[in-house]
UniProtKB/Swiss-Prot annotation:
Family listed: Belongs to the lyase 1 family. Argininosuccinate lyase subfamily.
UniProt cross-references to SUPFAM superfamilies, sorted A to Z: L-aspartase-like (SSF48557)
CDD domains per the UniProt record, alphabetical: Argininosuccinate_lyase
Pathway: Amino-acid biosynthesis; L-arginine biosynthesis; L-arginine from L-ornithine and carbamoyl phosphate: step 3/3
Gene3D superfamilies: Fumarase/aspartase (C-terminal domain) (1.10.40.30), Fumarase/aspartase (Central domain) (1.20.200.10), Fumarase/aspartase (N-terminal domain) (1.10.275.10)
Protein name according to UniProt: Argininosuccinate lyase
GO biological process, one term: L-arginine biosynthetic process
Source domain of life: Bacteria
Catalytic activity: 2-(N(omega)-L-arginino)succinate = fumarate + L-arginine
EC identifiers of the protein: 4.3.2.1
Source species: Rhodopseudomonas palustris (strain TIE-1)
Keyword Transmembrane listed: no
Example of a GO MF term: argininosuccinate lyase activity
């Protein structure tokens, strides 16, 4: 005879391989707090509905509190033979309070139980991620305000394109992270419905109050269809999707840090706190924190792809395949959390090299567009003609091996005789960034205004969170 808690139907014990492939406690033990919280809400509702006695509910609640304390203190023994977190908790509850523990599972299945637990877990992840991203935005906006006047090269195709400010570059990531936070917040809204009470798949004949348990657990409402309630994992997929986009943003920034800290580029410097050395080359300072962010963010994308593949062929309702929804997701969430904290630390730690940045900003004829704009504004030249004239002037400068502002005026006039010495005023990198005053442009005053606005907004968010 099977000794499993579900073993009444069975006359033989499971094969050892069956037990090995079926066990999930190594992963879902991380749901212990959510499992206990949901069970307490379920027990209270059962008592309120007269399905179990108030005394049984009281004893169940006390027993669950004891189990929570044991797990938190590291004194709880998780048993693989009991398969999962639900059976481990229920078994220990029976040891503590006796037969009343068996009443807890009335009008409930492990199908809706695990769906509830994992929703609560992912909701916690969403809230923690939002707070971590807000801290990253804070760090970025503070550094942007500090570096609003620091000129650096802006790039397209990884080639010097136009001068920008370091503050402007940092503010670009503030905006990216804002979209990330918006996606996580939207995912939370759709997640926040309770599957508890859907039972195995068809609901229950007991007069339960699903609205009461939903409210007790902080959900907006119970899910409207019991089949959907136990078989839905959209909330994990959507969270992992938002996490994957966020991971891409973090990885892009990490890549920039790797490039900028290279001695060949030298735009920024990381302290010893976020670099490591070499076991053979004494001089090395490697940006390993940034490189590891770049690598670990791939785990997030992998978790999304893995769960999509698990879910794509499953008919309604619950299938055992769905037991595989947690490990990859949890690892992905952990990788994202670490990456956010690492990037936040590096943002606070990094120091720009202003002179090198300024020099690099002027390389590659980065103020050529400023020359073309001057021709349009001053000489009323059509932009396409100004583009052509500027290209010829750049060609002359390149042939002579000089910067645009170093090219003699006579050489410029050989291409366009109406050019005057006034053009020199727009060819410095400082004048270039100051002129970019259009909304969203890199002008220092724009950067300061946007950084201050974001810091004010973030301070307000902190008060209301």
């Amino acid at each position: 005879m099977s000794n499993k808690m579900w073993g009444g139907r069975f006359t033989d014990r499971p094969d050892a391989i069956m037990e090995e492939i079926n066990v999930s406690i190594d992963v879902d033990r991380h749901l212990y707090a959510q499992d206990i919280t949901a069970s307490k809400a379920h027990a209270a509702m059962l008592a309120a509905q007269g399905i179990i006695t108030a005394n049984d509910a009281k004893n169940i609640g006390k027993g669950l509190d004891t189990i929570l304390s044991e797990i938190t203190a590291g004194k709880f023994t998780f048993k693989r033979a009991l398969e999962d977190i639900h059976m481990n908790v229920e078994s220990r509850l029976a040891e503590l309070i006796g037969p009343a523990a068996g009443r807890l599972h009335t009008a409930r299945s492990r199908n809706d139980q695990v769906a509830t637990d994992f929703r609560l877990y992912v909701r916690d992840v969403l809230d923690e991620t939002d707070a971590a991203l807000a801290a990253l935005q804070q760090a970025l906006a503070e550094r942007a305000l500090e570096q609003a006047d620091t000129v650096m090269p802006g790039f397209t195709h990884l080639q010097t394109a136009q001068p920008v400010t370091f503050g402007h570059h940092l503010m670009a990531y503030v905006e990216m992270v804002a979209r990330d936070r918006g996606r996580f917040q939207d995912a939370r809204k759709r997640l926040n419905e309770s599957p508890l009470g859907a039972a195995a798949l068809a609901g229950t004949s007991f007069p339960i109050d699903r609205h009461a348990t939903a409210a007790k657990l902080g959900f907006d409402r119970p899910m409207a269809n019991s089949l959907d309630a136990v078989s839905d994992r959209d909330f994990v997929l959507e969270t992992l999707s938002a996490a994957s986009i966020c991971a891409v943003h973090l990885s892009r920034f990490a890549e920039e840090i790797v490039i900028w800290t290279s001695p060949l580029v030298g735009l920024i410097r990381l302290s010893d706190k976020f670099t490591t050395g070499s076991s053979i080359m004494p001089q090395k300072r490697n940006p390993d924190a940034a490189e590891l962010v770049r690598a670990k963010t791939g785990r997030v994308i992998g978790a999304l792809n893995g769960l999509l593949i698990v879910m794509k062929g499953l008919p309604l309702a619950y299938q055992k395949d769905m037991q595989e929804d947690k490990q990859g997701a949890m690892e992905g969430f952990a990788a994202l959390s670490l990456a956010i904290r690492a990037i936040t630390g590096m943002v606070r730690d990094l120091e720009p090299e202003p002179e090198r940045m300024k020099l690099a900003a002027g390389e590659g004829y980065a103020t050529a567009t400023d020359l073309a704009d001057w021709l349009v504004r001053t000489l009323k030249m059509p932009f396409r003609e100004a583009h052509h004239v500027t290209g010829r002037i750049v060609g002359l400068a390149a042939k002579k091996g000089v910067a645009l502002h170093e090219l003699p005026l006579a050489e410029m006039q050989s291409v366009e005789k109406r050019i005057t010495k006034d053009v020199l005023a727009v060819l410095s990198v400082e004048s270039s960034v100051k002129s970019r005053t259009s909304y969203g442009g890199t002008a220092p005053k724009n950067v300061r205004s946007q950084a201050k606005a974001w810091l004010k907004r973030l301070a307000k968010d902190t008060k209301t969170r």
